Amino acid sequence: VACCWIDSVPSIFISGQVYLNQTIGNTGLRQVGVQEFDIVNMVKSSTKYAVIVKDPNLIKYHLEKAYFLSTEGRPGPVWIDIPANIQNAKIDVAKLIGFKEKKKIINYKRLNKKIREIARILLKSKRPMLHLGQGVKISQGEKYLRKIINDYKIPFALTWNASDLIESSHKSYIGRPGAFAERGTNFIVQNSDFYLAIGTRLPFMVTGYNSGDFARNAKKIMVDIDDKELVNTNVKLDKKICCDAKYFLKTFLKSLPKKFNPSKDWLLYCKNIRKKYPIVLDEFKSQKKYINSYDFIDSLSDVLKNDDIVVTDMGLSFVGT
């Protein structure tokens, strides 16, 4: 649940509970029923919606509301706790009350104006880069993203949980910045003059703890569907847009002219700095006694097919991949 909450994974958790009259309710007790536990209050801080069903005729309402909230806006987990007597109750499906969605009202005219302004800033830059996170994947904005990087050759970096968003062999790919990342990519970030983060919340693992120095020479712009991330980020932003990543990319693409490419010197710099500071060093490949983990992952990547699935644990296996 905590991972789904932090990584914005839409998910529905349904748990069984003791009979409603055997729950602690508002008594302040720790337990009444056999093996009872107040799971709802425990998961409230890491879910978008958590409820114990007290009326069997409201089951449709709770299920529909949970599904809507799980997938609406920034996705996340929801939890429905169903007592045993509610599970056993007879209901008339035709009479069940449903949930009426209330979608957020967006001023698209104002939003589009902001996006066009970002496009104008990009056109004035000489050393631009994009930093793309899982928000792009969640919004299914890959189509517009790929069009942008293919047509305009803008160097782009990925966050760890968006590593499979676009192939790492792409000519404009510059790696992953951050504390556990690529040194060359960090140099690129620090030398950019236009830094656009889309669908990534810019945690300390990316910016470092002295976040005031992150991309210090760049106009820093952040696009995120969660306004709280925009307000509470540790990076001083020049522009911030609360917006779905797919909508932003689609509108951003429309705002760009047919021809625009970053400076050739900048593209050459990005290429050379990554060559100068590779992840897999030559000495890694010449180890005799043991297999170097970085060399192993690099070799494994060469033989994996596009549809192969790789599951990693934390620690070295996670960082290495």
Q: What is the predicted role of each segment?
A:
Residues W79-D81, G133, K264-Y269, D313-M314:
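Short coil/turn segments at secondary-structure boundaries
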Residues I97-K114, N261-I291:
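Long, charged amphipathic helices and adjacent flexible linkers at domain junctions
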Residues V1-K259, S299, V303-I309:
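N-terminal alpha/beta PP-like core and its mobile active-site loop of ThDP/TPP-dependent enzymes
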Residues V43, I118, F252, W266-I273, ...:
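Generic structural signal of hydrophobic/aromatic residues within well-ordered alpha-helices
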Residues K271-T321:
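Active-site diphosphate/adenylate-binding microenvironment
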